[in-house]
Structures are given as C-alpha cells and as structure tokens.
UniProtKB/Swiss-Prot annotation:
Family: Belongs to the tyrosinase family. Hemocyanin subfamily.
Signal sequence bounds: 1-18
Location of the protein in the cell: Secreted, Extracellular space
Glycosylation site residues: N313
Bridged cysteine pairs (disulfide): C558-C606
Assembly notes: 36-chain polymer consisting of 6 hexamers, each of which includes 4 different chains, A, B, C and D.
Protein name, as recorded: Hemocyanin subunit A
Entry function: Hemocyanins are copper-containing oxygen carriers occurring freely dissolved in the hemolymph of many mollusks and arthropods.
Source organism per UniProt: Scutigera coleoptrata (House centipede)
Keywords: Copper, Disulfide bond, Glycoprotein, Metal-binding, Oxygen transport, Secreted, Signal, Transport
C-alpha cells in the first residue's frame, strides 16, 4: 500500500491552515491607515508637519528625547536602551488603540525618528489590538539605508527636471576587480536580507522584559541560530563565487583586511555612514576598552567549560542540554534577559559599536558611525560575518562539549526514508535547480527629499531560483498512521580547494531549507513539498509589495527572503548535498505551543511572538552537535537521507 501526501503549512504544536485561522478584525485596515498617517512624517521632510499635541502630562515623558534627532538609533549601543525601553513601554501600556495612537503622536514629536520607528514596530507587533496590522518595512521608511547615494541622487535629478513618477535602473552590476567582496554585493546589499535582519530584532527586542508580555521562548537560542544561518549562507555565497570561506575575527590588535564603503547617506539629516579603509585596527572607546571585551569572552568560555553561568547573586545556573544554549544566547547577545550582564557584559553588541567607530572612536573628528552601528545596515559589511563567525565559535565551543547524539536517539524505528528527489517545475531534469537574476520594482513614496511630491520606482536586481518541490519516498512500518516532522538542510559538498568537506566542517555550513509536518499512512508514502512553502522564508511581497495589500495577512514575516532560499551556485553547476531527516511528531511537538496564526510563517528562524517555539528539538537538529566518525554515512540512520543536488547559475535576467 502506498499513498501520495501533499505537505501543508505547519506549526509543530498544531497543523494550521490559513482557513482555520480566526478572521482578521474588520477594522484592521482602518487602524493601518491611522498608523500610516503617523509614520508618513518619518524621514520625509516634505510631508506637511502636524502640530505636537498639547497638554500631555510631562511626568510621563521623563527620560524621552535624549538621543538627538540627527543621530542613527543603534540597538547595539546600550547607552540608548533606557530611552528605547521607555519609548516601547509608553506605547505598549496604552489602554486601547485610540490611546495608543494619541501616545504615538506625542512620542513622534519628542524622540529620535529612528528610535520612534523601532518602538512603534515593537508595539504594533506585540499589542493585542494591532494584530493583523502590517507596518511598512524599514526599507520603505528609510530607502536611504538600502539604496546607495548615487541612485537616490539620480531619482532627485529626474524629479528636479519635472519627471512624474520617474524610473531609475539600479540593476547594472559594476565590475570591481580590486575588491573581491564586490562579487557578493547581490547578497550583502540585498534589500530583503537586510530588512530581515532588522525585523528579526523587532520580533526579538534586546530590551524585552517579561513585564512587557510573555517571556520570549528560546530567544537566546534563536539569536544564536538565526545569525549562525546568516554566516552559513554567506559562506555558501562565497564558495559560489570562487572565494574562500570567511575567517573569524580573532585578534583585537590585528589590522582588519576588509575595508568597506557603504555609500549610504540619510538625506533628511545628512548622516553619512562612515567609510572604513582596510588595515585599520579596532581601538578602545572612551566608555569601553578592548581588554574588557577580552575579559567578557574569557568569562563566557570559562562558564562553558564549567558548564555553569553565575547569576548576579552568585547562584550557579547549569548550562544543561535543554536550556544551556538559550542562556548563553541571552548572555552573549547580550539582552536584558542575560543572567548577569554586569559580569558577562555585552560582547556581541559592543563589538558592533567598536567596529562602527573604528576610524573616529572618541569622536574628535565628528564622523558619523559606520554601517555596523545600525541593525538595518550592519549585514551589508563583510566584517559582520567575520564578527558573527567569532560569536558562532563561542556557541560551537558549548555545542562541542555536549555528547554526540547516539544511534538510539537518532533512530525512528517505525520509519525508513528511502529516497528524496528535487524536482524543478520546469525542465526534464531531477536533483538540479537553476538560479538567475530577477528584476523587481522598489517603489519610493512621496515626501522624501529625493521624491518630493511624486512617487518613484527603482529597478533592483536580486538572485532568484526556479520553483521546485521535494519528492520524499518513505515507508511507515508502524501499522497505523503517523505524523512525521521533516527537516531539510543543504550544504556545499566541496571546500575552496575542491576537496570533500570533513563532516564536522560541512555541518557548520548546513543551511535550513524547510521544516514541516506530514501524515504518513501505513506502508509506502510519497510526500511532496513545494519550495514556496518553506518555513524559513517570507514572500518577496513583503519586500517589494504594497503594504495595504498585506493588511489582512496572518504573517509577521520576519523570515529570510524567499528568493534567497538557495545559494547562487556556479555557471558550470556547483554540487551541494541535501540532508533530510524524518522525526516523530509525537516526540517533537509542544503541547502548549498554541495556535500561532499571527506568525505561522518563518517559524524556523523567528519563533513565535508570544507562544512557545513549537518544536522540542534543538534548532538545527540533528546537526547541532559534533558527529563522531569520518563521514555522514556512519552517522546516518534509517530515517535520514542525503544525496547530491546541483545548483547552476544561468546568468539570465528575468523582469517582472
């Protein structure tokens, strides 16, 4: 007996279809319009200003208005955290939606615009009465953080010459043989990828405390895993472009090999993100020196080797298998949930600040900070990935201290995974997927310094892949129907020298492609899963679409852009290996995860806004721990599969 099953969009706690989610409140679009009216002034000097509401109780505004308007708000600089926390609380504590709008209008006139947008995003995502409301993504509010200065100057010139709704072509890829990293500009400077990084930090604010709402389940682990995946994806892109994998940042006193020129300017304020020439050395800041950073790292590693962290009162907190990675994530990020911020410090965030101020650490020259200072721009810089590989290696130290999974733990006796085939929707080939360039329209609204009273369109080019599906051949020998969780990963097969990767090097490069639930009938089953259904990604509509068309969506869309699901590959084809693992849903699902309709997309990287992460397994399972033996074949159990997949870049450009 065999059956064909089509896998559905899922949450491990409960399988949820869109038609099972409660309807979005009828007033959602009205609420969106009120929010759009508020933020229509942000970063738009030519939008007519409204007067500040009068008569508000000034005592409730104490501590707000400290960060100057012309500065960039940095979530990495903890000196801004008290004000950012106060701003978010001010909006979160509003008694109803009308009160929320009143408070937001007051706040907008009082605090730094960049900070206001962050606080507003956090509040809208987490308030009960704004569920279903989709605030415009950060790249719609600040195009100047995502488009280079010369593009926006061209837009302004066309507007100044009287063009209505001008169109600027930003798709031409300039060759720069002097900077090898320029080959990666399609990835580093991708609008959706950088917007994803910002939005992840909105869903999981470093300043979040339990008093603001439910504790963020596994937030520290999600911090580790999402950034680990970003680094793994970056390394895959480097190998696709015949570049070696990025080296971790190691020595605070070594010159940095990478320079970076962002060519980004905030037109309203004139803020110009700093250029960093190669060869600079990270220097002490007035408020923090490099020795403190070394000390924080040493204390964290000491805790890993002892398998404990020390709380502020001196209590030992075990870094056990279940919660250890989560505790470490909160301490390393660090967030306000760290068990002991005074002792373990803020190593991740302050490294961003040090890198951003590398050319003017004490401010004597009045330079603006570099892109590493800003959550919305930091992932553009190659140094971001060197730094996060350094952070990743600290987490790896902890993971390598854990016992490897045993064959007993890995095996699902009821199931045999026979084969997996990757089938493109067009073409007569299997286990091969083609990538290419795609051109989309990035729409700029009215009121910016460069658009004035008209709208404008910038044509941008991004990577894309052909649609495909997985065909999974699997036997269920339990004698009754069983639910399976399928976990799908991809990694390059060969290193930069053309040699097979050692298994523990390769597992560090595994990127998650999907995680889903399907029912296995007794006997033989063939499961189909579409690439577009990935639990990792968000639709490109959230990057290039119209916000009003998304107002009735149940998605919070914190995920990876769907068009970057696969790495670029090579013209001649590049061999990757696909890893698929089937595990028992009954063991994996979380009973009290709740029906999370609001954020049923992007669950793998982003988790849940207010419920438990609906998967009992560690993120990245079963490749999150070291593998003993010489290869995957020794590790593999009957419920696992691996095989070669070729990704070929065609070089074609498709315009929509």
């Amino acid at each position: 007996m065999w059956s064909l099953a089509l896998a559905t969009l899922f949450v491990l706690g409960t399988v949820i279809r869109a038609d099972q989610c409660p309807p979005v409140p009828a007033d959602t679009k009205d609420k969106l319009e009120k929010i759009l009216e508020l933020i229509g002034h942000v970063n738009r000097p030519l939008t007519p200003e409204t007067p500040e509401p009068a008569g508000y109780d000034e005592t409730k505004l104490k501590g707000l208005g400290i960060l100057p308007q012309h500065e960039i708000f940095s979530l990495f600089d903890e000196r801004t955290w008290p004000e950012a926390t106060k701003a978010a609380e001010f909006l979160m504590e509003a008694t109803d939606f009308e009160h929320f709008i009143q408070r937001a209008d007051v706040l907008r006139h009082r605090i730094n615009e960049d900070m206001f947008m962050y606080a507003l995003n956090v509040a809208v995502l987490h308030r009960k009465d704004t569920r279903g409301v989709q605030v415009p993504r950060i790249h719609k509010i600040y195009p100047d953080k995502f488009l280079k200065q010369d593009i926006l100057v061209e837009v302004r010139e066309k507007v100044n010459h009287g063009e209505e709704k001008p169109v600027v072509d930003a798709t031409e890829l300039h060759q720069n043989q002097l900077d090898p990293n320029y080959r990666l500009s399609y990835f580093l400077e991708d609008i959706g990828m950088n917007s994803h990084h910002y939005h992840w930090h909105v869903v999981h604010p470093a300043v979040w405390l339990p008093k603001h709402g439910p504790r963020k389940d596994r937030k520290g682990e999600l911090f580790y895993y999402m950034h680990h995946q970003m680094v793994a994806r970056y390394d895959s892109e480097r190998l696709s472009n015949n570049l070696p994998r990025t080296e971790p940042f190691e020595n605070w006193d070594d010159p940095l090999e990478e320079g970076y020129a962002p060519h980004l300017t905030i037109h309203k304020t004139g803020y110009n993100y700093m250029f960093r020439p190669e060869g600079l050395i990270v220097r002490d800041l007035p408020e923090l020196n490099k020795n403190k950073m070394r000390q924080w790292k040493s204390r964290i590693l000491h805790g890993i080797h002892l398998n404990v962290l020390y709380a502020e009162n001196g209590t030992k907190i075990s870094l056990d298998n279940e919660h250890g990675i989560d505790l470490l994530g909160d301490a390393i990020e660090s967030s306000l949930l760290s068990v002991n911020r005074a002792f373990y410090g803020n190593i991740h965030c302050y490294a961003h600040v040090m890198a951003a101020r590398i050319a003017d650490p004490d401010g004597r020259y009045g330079e603006d900070n570099g892109v590493m200072h800003d959550v919305a721009t930091s992932a553009r810089d190659p140094l971001f990935y060197r730094w996060h590989k350094f952070i990743d290696n600290i987490f790896l130290e902890y993971k390598d201290n854990l016992d490897p999974y045993t064959q007993y733990e890995l095996t699902w006796p009821d199931v045999v995974l026979n084969d997996v085939t990757v089938k493109p929707h067009k073409g007569d080939y299997d286990d091969e997927v083609h990538t290419y360039w795609e051109v989309d329209n990035y729409e700029l609204g009215k009121g910016f310094d460069y658009t004035r009273k008209t709208t404008a369109t910038v044509k941008v080019r991004h990577l894309q892949h052909e649609d495909y599906h997985y065909e999974i051949d699997i036997d269920n020998n339990a004698g009754k129907a069983k639910k399976a969780v399928f976990r799908i990963f991809l990694a390059p097969k060969y290193n930069e020298k053309g040699e097979l990767f050692p298994v523990n090097e390769q597992r560090q490069l595994l990127v998650e492609l999907d995680k889903f639930v399907a029912t296995l009938e007794p006997g033989h089953n063939v499961i189909e899963r579409q690439s577009k259904e990935s639990s990792v990604t968000m639709s490109k509509d959230h990057v290039f679409g119209e916000i009003r068309n998304l107002a009735d969506d149940h998605q919070c869309s914190c995920g990876w852009p769907d068009y970057l699901l696969l790495p670029k590959g090579k013209y001649e084809g590049m061999t990757y290996q696909l890893f698929v693992v089937a595990t028992d849903y009954e063991e994996d699902h979380v009973e009290d995860a709740g029906e999370e309709c609001q954020c049923r997309d992007s669950m793998s990287y982003c988790g849940s806004v207010e419920h438990k992460l609906p998967d009992n397994k560690p993120l990245g399972y079963p490749f999150d721990r070291r593998i003993d033996g010489t290869g995957f074949e020794e590790f593999k159990t009957q419920n696992m599969y691996y095989g070669d997949v070729v990704i070929q870049f065609t070089g074609e450009t498709v315009t929509h």
